[in-house]
């Protein structure tokens, strides 16, 4: 925990502006009024408790989803100040909950470091809740105040004596604001709670669900902090050295923590945080780390004669292959920029991170020559594969990005050139591809048949991936490029539809394609361009009429219902479609491709870390985690093709 700031009292609560606009324009303060915004309310309150932990005063935090989907957050910090705040003439706790930008975060007195720009937190949550109440446990007393839609109900009062210290906040999100949903997602909250436990070494933090039929509780506490985080991220991977490297230092009031470990895989996974906020877009702390890592490894390799004089320098891409790293900084005044305000902009952080990491990592390599040699050798192998991939890439470029005659996948393109209207169906097998070509709308639907199972990219290096014809044809058809040349704005289709058979092989091909998109074309997944077609599982024919039943866990019940509702004569016949090839072009269009009638599932990434681990477990080299997953989930299997 950081060095404690001085006393925390009413004089440290500063007021910047009023609260009127929050209910009129909630999106300006919490991003949206969808499920994302609803969950954001929780973090605004939790961040206040985390600030107490960062300052060294709180040791435990509890987050509770109450039976009515309201939220309670409990901490054992100092308790929000209850004295009179000079500017407002009201108790400090009331000021915190009723005045926008009031808090102990702006003057640097209450907190040396706080959770990003969350000074707006408490008052915004109050404004967007039908009711909120706060209990402050301080100086032997329990202080209580209640609010309705941001307005004070009663003056702050003492309701009992106590030997506890801390703050408890309970709020009910306002359904007038959150019109889409007021139902909390336990797993979503638990993921972030666990992340906060990793980022704040030694903190005890729990999440509990008290809703009927959903009761659950998870408690997190990691003495290893981000070192434990790296171990968690690499749980299903084969690592090159057993224990993650951990580096910590402080300069100019900026604390830098880095933990890293290499795996035998081909993908890097670098997560960066500033004041506990996940900086998805990176920033100066991440670039400082990357620059330093590349320079230190190259210097070490030359000094130890692990590379020859005329060997080409290892690039950043080379030294990051197979790397899992977490970079976490704490800064008194973080500046966030970028599209989603998740990119750290402070220029001094780059220098501090570079300097601190360089010093500690150089020392580590000198003291651990075996590990140092393993890291350099991995980088050199990556360099060879990169140069081979570069040659393959140049060959592909010379053929021209859109010369369809060069596509081994036999792309049947559409006539429209408007990417927003265009759809690319990736179809399993030539026979289904033929039906799809016949049945499609040629104006906006393109068909790319793929033969057999494509390469599992989770286990392959870039040069092997680019040598695979099916994958090359897909990259070329999309027009986005790949790897370092990838550009989502060049996508020729804004709907990429995976259309496979409803059997085990079809599911496998679908997973292989999703692995490819996630690992090498992730921006198209994040942009919402990837879909999975939902061809029917059954066709019930009676006379000239056909009723289709979609796949899903209730498919059998749906089929029984359809049969029950049909007249007994003429006798209906049931066909189970195992393959797309069993449908003619008219049926395929009607059931799976017609925008007016079809069902499609859009692929999204809600939790990138979990997605990363699932792909590694299902598609990676290690058998044990996969076997454990199968044993754990086998009882869910309903239809098994043997």
Swiss-Prot record:
One example GO MF annotation: DNA negative supercoiling activity
Family annotation (SUPFAM superfamilies): ATPase domain of HSP90 chaperone/DNA topoisomerase II/histidine kinase, Ribosomal protein S5 domain 2-like, Type II DNA topoisomerase
Q: Which PROSITE patterns match?
A: TOPOISOMERASE_II, TOPRIM
Q: What is its main location?
A: cytoplasm
Q: Which residues are listed for Mg(2+) 1 binding in this entry?
A: 428, 501
Q: Which Pfam families match?
A: DNA_gyraseB, DNA_gyraseB_C, HATPase_c, Toprim
Q: Where in the cell is it found?
A: Cytoplasm
Catalyzed reaction equations: ATP-dependent breakage, passage and rejoining of double-stranded DNA
Provide the binding site for Mg(2+) 2: 501, 503
Cofactor (UniProt)? Mg(2+); Mn(2+); Ca(2+)
**Site positions (Interaction with DNA):** 453, 456
PANTHER family assigned: DNA GYRASE SUBUNIT B, MITOCHONDRIAL (PTHR45866:SF1), DNA GYRASE/TOPOISOMERASE SUBUNIT B (PTHR45866)
Q: Which NCBIfam families match?
A: gyrB, PRK05644.1, PRK14939.1
Q: How does it assemble?
A: Heterotetramer, composed of two GyrA and two GyrB chains. Within the heterotetramer, GyrA contains the active site tyrosine that forms a covalent intermediate with the DNA, while GyrB contributes the cofactor binding sites and catalyzes ATP hydrolysis.
* UniProt similarity note: Belongs to the type II topoisomerase family.
Q: What is this protein called?
A: DNA gyrase subunit B
Species of origin: Enterococcus faecalis (strain ATCC 700802 / V583)
């Amino acid at each position: 925990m950081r060095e404690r700031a001085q006393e925390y009292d009413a004089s440290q609560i500063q007021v910047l502006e009023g609260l009127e606009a929050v209910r009129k324009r909630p999106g300006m303060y919490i991003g949206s009024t969808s499920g994302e915004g609803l969950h954001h309310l929780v973090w605004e309150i939790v961040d206040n408790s985390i600030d107490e932990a960062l300052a060294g005063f709180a040791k435990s935090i509890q987050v509770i989803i109450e039976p009515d989907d309201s939220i309670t957050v409990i901490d054992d910090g100092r308790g929000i100040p209850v004295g009179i705040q000079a500017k407002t003439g009201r108790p400090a706790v009331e000021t915190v909950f009723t005045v926008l930008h009031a808090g102990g975060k702006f003057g640097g007195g209450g907190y040396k470091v706080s959770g990003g720009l969350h000074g707006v937190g408490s008052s915004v949550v109050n404004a967007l809740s039908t009711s909120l109440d706060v209990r402050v446990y301080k100086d032997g007393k329990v202080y209580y105040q209640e609010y309705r839609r941001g307005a004070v109900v009663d003056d702050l009062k003492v309701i009992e004596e106590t030997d506890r210290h801390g703050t408890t906040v309970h709020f009910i999100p306002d359904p007038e604001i959150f019109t889409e949903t007021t139902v909390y997602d336990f797993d979503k909250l638990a993921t972030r709670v666990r992340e906060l436990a990793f980022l704040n070494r030694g903190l005890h933090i729990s999440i509990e669900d008290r809703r009927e039929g959903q009761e659950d509780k998870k408690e997190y506490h990691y003495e290893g902090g981000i070192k434990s985080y790296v171990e968690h991220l690499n749980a299903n991977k084969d690592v090159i050295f057993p224990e993650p490297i951990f580096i910590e230092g402080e300069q100019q009031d900026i604390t830098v923590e880095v933990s890293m470990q290499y795996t035998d895989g081909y993908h890097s996974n670098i997560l960066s945080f500033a004041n506990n906020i996940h900086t998805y877009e990176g920033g100066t702390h991440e670039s400082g780390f990357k620059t330093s890592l590349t320079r230190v490894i190259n210097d070490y390799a030359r000094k130890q004669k692990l590379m020859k004089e005329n060997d080409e320098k290892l690039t950043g891409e080379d030294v990051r292959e197979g790397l899992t790293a977490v970079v976490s900084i704490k800064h008194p005044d973080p500046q966030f920029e970028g599209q989603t305000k998740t990119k750290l902009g402070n220029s001094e952080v780059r220098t501090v991170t570079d300097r601190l990491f360089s010093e500690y990592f150089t020392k580590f390599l000198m003291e651990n020559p075996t590990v140092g040699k393993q890291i350099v050798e991995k980088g050199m192998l990556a360099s060879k594969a990169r140069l081979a991939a570069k040659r393959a890439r140049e060959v592909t470029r010379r053929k021209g990005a859109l010369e369809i005659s060069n596509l081994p996948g036999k792309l049947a393109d559409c006539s429209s050139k408007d990417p927003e209207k265009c759809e690319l169906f990736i179809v399993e097998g030539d026979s289904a591809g033929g039906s799809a070509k016949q049945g499609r709308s040629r104006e906006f639907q393109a068909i790319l048949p793929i033969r057999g199972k494509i390469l599992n990219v989770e286990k392959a290096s870039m040069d092997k991936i680019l040598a695979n014809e099916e994958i090359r044809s897909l990259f070329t058809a999309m027009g986005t490029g790949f790897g370092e040349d990838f550009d989502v704005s060049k996508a020729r289709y804004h709907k990429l539809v995976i259309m496979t058979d409803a059997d085990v092989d079809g599911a496998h091909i679908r997973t292989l394609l999703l692995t490819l998109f996630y690992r090498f074309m992730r921006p198209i997944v994040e942009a919402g361009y990837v879909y999975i077609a939902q061809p029917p599982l059954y066709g019930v024919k009676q006379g000239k009429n056909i009723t289709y039943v979609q796949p899903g866990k209730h498919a059998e019940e749906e089929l029984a219902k359809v049969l029950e509702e049909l007249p007994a004569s003429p006798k209906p016949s049931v066909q189970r479609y195992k393959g797309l090839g069993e449908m003619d072009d008219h049926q395929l269009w009607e059931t799976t491709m017609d925008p007016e009638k079809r069902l499609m599932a859009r692929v999204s990434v809600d939790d990138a870390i979990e997605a990363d681990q699932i792909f590694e477990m299902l598609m990676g080299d290690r058998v044990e985690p996969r076997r454990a997953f199968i044993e754990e989930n086998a009882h869910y299997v309903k239809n098994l093709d043997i």
